[in-house]
Structure formats: C-alpha cells, structure tokens
Amino acid sequence: MVKHMFLEDVNNLISDDKWLIFQNEYNTEVNPRYETLFTLTNGYMGVRGTFEEGSEGERSGNFIAGIFDKSDAQVREIVNAQNWLRIKLYVEGEELSLDKCQLIEFKRILDMKKGILFRSMLIKDSKDRITRIEGYRFISRSDLHRSAIKLFVTPVNYSGVVGIESIIDGTVLNSADSPKHRVKHLKVADNSSLNKSGVYLETATIDDDIRIATGSAVRLYHYEDKEKNNIAKFKRFLPLGEMSIEYFEFDGTENKTVVIDKFIITYTSRDVKKGLLKSTVEKELFAFAGEGIDKELQRHIEVYEELWSVADINIEGDEEADKALRFNIFHLMSSVNENDPMVSIAAKALHGEGYKGHVFWDTEIFMLPFFIYVHPKAAKTLLMYRYNMLDAARKNAALNGYKGAQYPWESADTGEEETPKWGFDYMGNPVRIWTGDLEHHITADIAFAVWEYFRATEDIEFMLNYGAEVIFETARFWVSRCEYVKELDRYEINNVIGPDEFHEHVDNNAYTDYLAKWNIKKGLELINMLKEKYPEHYHAISNKKCLTNEEMEKWKEVEEKIYIPYDKDKKLIEQFEGYFDKKDYVIDKFDENNMPIWPEGVDITKLGDTQLIKQADVVMLMLLLGEEFDEETKRINYEYYEKRTMHKSSLGPSMYAIMGLKVGDHKNAYQSFMRSANVDLVDNQGNTKEGLHAASAGGTWQVVVFGFGGMEIDKEGALNINSWLPEKWDKLSYKVFWKGNLIEVIVTKQEVTVKKLKGKGNIKVKVKGKELTIE
C-alpha cells in the first residue's frame, strides 16, 4: 500500500492497489508515456497527464471532442486547446522546478476506480528548503464542464513567503515538439479578470472561429481551517499576451499545510452561443467555487461507481492481467460522451495528437462491441455520429465516381475525408499515403457495426429511423464499386488496401470483397424484413432513397457474383490476388515484449513485395463472419497468417488471441492477449506518447469476453457461451447487456454460471452447446 505518503484526507480517497497505476520515479525519458497513461477524460474533454508546474520535454494536451481546425496543417486535426493545468510555486522567489530542484520523494497514482490522478513529492531547492507537495485532480464525469485541482503545500524545514502562479496558457501548439509540423490553431479572443475573483481566456480557431472558453479561480486556506478563510496577502491579475495569470503570495509556516483549490470551467461555441460564453463560464465558475471541490468530486465518483458496476471484469489468479484489463476498460469507458451524437472516439481517443484526433474503423470494429454490451446508450450515440455524417459520405462517394455512401478512411467533425496525403515510412522517408484513396472496407465495417448493435439490443427504433438507411446506402456504394469482368462472369473489387496496410493497390482483397458481399446481402435481407414487418417504414425509406425493384435485382446479381480468392480444397484464403506469389518470410524471433522482430533479409522499404503483413486481415474476416467458415478453415488460415504477421499495428494481437482460442492455440492466444493488454502499459509499439491505443483497449475487452469468456452470437441470433480459461486463471466474471437484460457470466475451470441481474422475461443461452433458460 502507498497511503503512508499522503495526508489523511487524500489517503481516504485512494482505492485498493488493484485499481491503481503507479509512477514511482521522475524521468524525462518516460514521462511522455505516463502523460498518456495518466490522461483524464470525460468524453467531452481530455487532458494529458502532464505536471501542473510543467516539466522538460512534456507533451501537454487539452483536447475537446469535436473541435478541429486545419490552419497550416495538411488536414483538419484536433485542436490542442489552452492549458489550464498550470500552477507554479515559488519559495522566496525561487521556482520549485521539477528539473532544477532535487526530488527527495516522488510518486503519482492513477486511481481507475474513481478517475482521479494523485501526486506526492518532497522537493529541495537550491537553499536546502524542503517542501512537500501532494494532491489530486479530476475532470468531472458528472458535470462535463467542471475540472478541479487540489494541492496541499507544506514547508517542511522553513518559514517564508510562498508564491503561486495559476495560469491558463493559450500559447499552445499542435506538434509543438516538431519544427517541421508544428501548427498554431488558436488566437486569443478575450483575456480578462472575472470580477477580480478568477481569470478568463477565450480562444478562437483560425479557420472556423470556433470559440473555446476557460475560466479558473483559486482559493487558498490553511488545512486545519474548516472555514477555509483566504490567506493570500498579495494578489495580482496578469493578462500576459496569450496567458491569463493570477499570482498570489502567502506566509508559509514550517510544518503548516496550505491548501490550493483550483476550479476550472470549460465551454465552447458548440455548447452555447458565442455571445453567452463568458457569462456562462463566469456563472458556472463561481457556483462551483462556492460549492467547493468535495461535492463535485463525490458526484464524479458516483458516476464511475455506476459505470464500473457493469464494466468491471474480475480475473482471479492473474493479477497482471486483471489490472491491465481494468486499465484498458477505464480509458475506453472514460473516452465516450454518450450525449453528443456529433462526435466519436478517435484512434488515440482524447489522449494525444496521434492520428490527428481522427476517427477510423477502429471505433466500429474494435471499440464498439464493448459499448454495445456494456453501455448500449453510448454505442447508439457512436453509431449516430456515423448517421449524422451520412450526407458527407454520400458526397464522398459522388466525388469518387460512386453511388450511395462511401465513408472516409479518416473522419473528423465534417465527415469528409481527412487522411493526409503524405507521411513517413519506417526509415523516415516521405511516402504517399494511399489509405484515404483505397482503404474502402471501412464502409462495410460501419454497416457491420450497425447490424451488430441491432442484433444485441433489438433497438428497432434505431434501425428503422437510422440504421437501415446506413446499410442501404453503403450497399448501394458497393454495388457501384464492383467491376464486372465479362469473360469470367464475376464482379471484382480492384485497387484497394485491406486491413493489412503493407500491401497497397491490390485486387480482390478477401476481407474487402467478403464484407462488401455481406453488406449487400444484409441490405437485401433488411429490405425483406421491412416489407414484411414494417411496411410503412419500408415505403417511407424506399421513397426517400428511391429503392426500385430494378436496383434490387442488380444488388442480387452483384452479391451472388462477387469474387473471393478462396481455394476450397486447400481451405486457404489468399489475402488478395497474387499474395502467394510474393517473397515469403516466416517470423521466428521476438523481442523482450514478445513482439515480432523483422526476419533477416527483409527490406522494410519494400514490404509490399513480401508475404509479411502488418496486422490481421484474413483472420479478421474469419472473426467477423465466423459462421461463414468451418473450424478447419479457421485453423489452416490462422496457422498460415499468424507466422507472417508483424503486429506493427496494435489492432492485431487481440484478434489473433480470439482466433487462437477458437482453433486451440491456447498458449499463443494468451501471449497475444497480454501483448494487447499491455500495449500502452509497457509501450510495446513504442508510440504510447502519441496517445492511447484505443482500438487495442477495445480488442483487449473482446479477447476476455468473446475469447476466454466464450461469448458469441450464432447464426440464429442466440447467445452462446463456450469459455476457456488460461492455466493461472481461477475464475473469470463479467457482465453484459443482452436484448435489454443485464446478465452476469461466471466462469471457472469446472462450470459456467449465467445469472440475470436486471430485465424482464426469460433469456435463452447456450452454454457449451446446452440450451438453458435464465429466469
């Protein structure tokens, strides 16, 4: 336990060790990784885990969902907004700098149960004065606009004047550490004092004049003073250009603790009209400061308690896996705003600037299953983002010469294609990025996600009013995307990139072709369902979308004749036409994190000439459409492609773990699971500093529930449980929503127990092939 390091008030807040992630030393080399690990977010805003006082080499970040700007960047990117964390301390004028003073003690703790970041340190300055600083901060999950910092400052061996600078810093940049790419997305619109009781900084984005308004107020008082009387003997407001600063001084007394409460309110012009921003922030700020931090903190903790009551998974017998899984779940469920259907979850969530804050297929295929089964309201909101971007997808299809709706590979706030045209290869050479032009499978991925949500929730209102249109318009795209080859009497999808991005400009990628076929077929099935059960809705949508019998016949023809490169005798699916003709390498060496090492002789600038792949492709297909393939086909393809997958994307290990369990490769499945679970905790991709691997977090949950927990939906739409536990696991328990009912599944080596916790009516579940009725 670590509680001896903290004051009693802080001790009482900290959860048990299984909920805690620790940083035990200050190190500028690894700090950027901890900044990502210790990011706090409520889905509306994410603030990286930098230090209040700042530090050398930090990557500060304050990201607000839905706030994008292009300015001088290649494409629209999430804006790094003004930094409100800053609190600098001075003793008799000398700054207590993490990089210039001596750190005698140091610890930071992320409390995942409560969504709080704790800190404690003992610091000695150049005059040998020792100061203890401890405290915590949180971004409220109850009121999304509220954040707070509480610090306890104790002069250990001196008395003297202590100064405090509370800063809202608008000098922030995107890509600040890269002279080649850094961009300024904000200009200051207002920097002012709030009735001498707080400060206000309002910024505006360069392109669209979106306003971001931040207000902060500081309260100083002695720790023992229950009345919290102000002890500042000097106070000054400094509107220094793009920084809004309050400076305070108080008389520090040896071994007497002073409390610094910093209250922060954030609003944007997405929330309220520009003319009302300042008055809204001021009103909310003083209401918050008047109430105090404790009440908001309690409400915040209660929201997390409610979320964890469904989301928490217990693994008994494997503490490392148990905590790593909890870490992934914490960040995933913290990253969604279930009340805003105009935003989604980016590939790096709100944890960093990686991938420019863009939304990929990661959300629908890797993250969404968690929300479907744990937080269905949030899942619906994420799908509504795609529905709300449907017009942009139609525009995208038309621009590319197709019909229907073609979703962009990278999406931001407008729904238009935001993939950069240029990037860098593994050697740092500039390369053309083709994913935005060619990685079309995302369109089918989104349709697939719509159907998966419907299967699990039976939310017919969503399907009738929103989901059906997405499936129809994406099916229409695929019919126009397919090319008819007369001499072979088949339809092909040529010049694409599949999930494996080592190979570009390929023809008939099996994943893409199969998902396109599925998308068109599902569109036809849905039309028949609507005709039969909801004729009024069918007539409305068919009139709106001009669905004709002639077009439906075309859909049937294309769906039946789409070509899949599949040798049914060998049962081996060729990833794309010509893949087996590439130079073959087999992976046989791994690094200290059990990640593959490039085979000897590989030219990593010409990976497209080899059979090495970046991530799961054919294996991914067999997971999504598992009912289409028999067990032997799955095993043969898993064994072939597993040896050739470099896992240069964090998306791969979780998928190989699930498939490994399905085909009996239990040892490698567990290793793949731990690769996925630890991707950020041990930084096995080497880029955690750029932000959370959010898709891997979702994939990690899938491995435990769909893999070890054995949960799947069969062809008939029934819930199946076919579990398998690793040797060191004694018990696994998880909860999911299934068609409006909350159920708990408890798995041991001896038995599987399924309980209904909430809901009406009986539930039928197949446990290891035996049908049970759960009352």
UniProtKB/Swiss-Prot annotation:
Annotated consequence of substituting E284Q: No change in kojibiose phosphorylase activity
Catalysed reactions listed for this entry: kojibiose + phosphate = beta-D-glucose 1-phosphate + D-glucose
GO term, biological process aspect, one: carbohydrate metabolic process
Recorded superkingdom: Bacteria
Keyword Glycosyltransferase applies: yes
Effect of K403Q: Retains 74% of kojibiose phosphorylase activity
Keyword terms, alphabetized: Carbohydrate metabolism, Glycosyltransferase, Transferase
Keyword Secreted: no
Binding sites annotated in the UniProt record for substrate: W361, D362, K614, Q615
Family per record: Belongs to the glycosyl hydrolase 65 family.
Name assigned to this protein: Kojibiose phosphorylase
